[in-house]
């Protein structure tokens, strides 16, 4: 039978807790600059893996600490790596934290001025292959004992942390590039099932 959209997500899709996220950030201190910037960008903005791979320097504004997400890189065996619009077909401008901006500044200064892409291949100025983060995340998770560490889980984590800290769902939806805020709310609810269950238990015990 077909699962409903509101079916519980498996563990690997749930968000990291605030404590787990802090541990991830500590682990990043030992990682290469490119990956520190990539992972922190995903946590900070909730952007998709392909959107980060498709980010160009012309879309980074250091004066306003914003990025414009206007392309998404995808890969299929038939087409290879190709460029599309973001998933909802719309460009969006997202602000980044001062920590992310500083890492991006450092990354920009480490690259030749002719490089267009923010995240490049190790031996080429071409954009990072969209499958590369998935492989790197697997190694990162094994190295630091983090289960189910993959890019999309950081997207769930970004939404979870934002809403938990008081951001309204409509604003978070716009930041994530969701065309419907109910998608964001489902993501938050699924990512925080354990917390919601504890709230229910607290109410019943009151």
Language-model-derived ranges and their functions:
Residues 23-36, 45, 94, 109-127, ...:
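Short, basic (Lys/Arg/His-rich) helix/loop patches that form interaction surfaces
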